[in-house]
A protein has these predicted regions:
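Amphipathic, non-membrane alpha-helical segments in soluble helical-bundle scaffolds
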Residues: 1-9, 35-42, 85-89, 128-131
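Alpha-helical bundle segments that constitute or directly flank the non-heme di-iron/ferroxidase center
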Residues: 1-24, 47-58, 132-136
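Short acidic/polar alpha-helix capping motifs at helix-coil junctions
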Residues: 3-6, 17-21, 62-65, 77-81, ...
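Short, contiguous alpha-helical
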Residues: 28-72, 114-153
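Surface-exposed helix-capping loop/turn segments at secondary-structure junctions
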Residues: 21-26, 104-112, 149-153
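Acidic/histidine-rich alpha-helical segments that form the ligand environment
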Residues: 7-11, 18, 75-113
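Short helix-to-loop capping/linker segments positioned immediately adjacent to catalytic or ligand/cofactor-binding
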Residues: 25-30, 86-88
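Conserved catalytic core of Hanks-type protein kinase domains
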Residues: 21, 44, 59, 102-105
């Protein structure tokens, strides 16, 4: 888990600076009415942080908790498109710093505890796998937001 928290700290430091360089106008552009703007995509990462924080904590004391969310609904209901990009970057950074703290304080014996992330069927994943996946997912979306080389997910 140490490697994961180190990667996450590097991502927070490097990418929060890059996100801060995107203009409000560029952050707000929707490529198509049904597609997310950069603000909404960053909002999706905020929602992901919320849900994964819950997974990382609840699965340490409950057996196979089911923690899922409807990403498009969350993005729409949160109203990210109407918020300033600066506020969204601050929120994204703060939540990810909290993810780092939760993962750092997690006892090693809990790395293998499962969490159910399946919406219709049971999909059990260990907390360690979820942490690794969280970093992959984060980098995939950050590269898309920043128009960097695509990272498959």
């Amino acid at each position: 888990m140490k490697k994961i928290t180190e990667q996450l700290q590097e991502i927070i430091s490097e990418y929060s600076e890059k996100l801060g360089q995107i203009s409000e106008t560029d952050f707000s552009i929707k490529p198509l009415p049904e597609k997310w703007s950069r603000k909404e995509e960053l909002g999706h990462l905020i929602d992901s942080a919320h849900n994964n924080l819950r997974r990382f904590m609840v699965a340490q004391y409950e057996t196979n908790p089911k923690i899922v969310y409807e990403q498009n609904r969350w993005v729409h209901m949160a109203g990210y498109q109407n918020q300033s990009s600066e506020e969204l970057v601050v929120l994204w950074k703060g939540l990810n710093l909290q993810v780092v703290e939760v993962l750092k304080s997690m006892p090693e014996k809990n790395f293998s505890r499962p969490c159910n992330t399946g919406k219709t069927e049971i999909e059990l994943h260990t907390l360690e796998w979820l942490a690794e996946d969280y970093v992959r997912h984060l980098k995939h979306h950050l590269h898309h937001i920043l128009e960097l080389e695509a990272i498959p997910y």
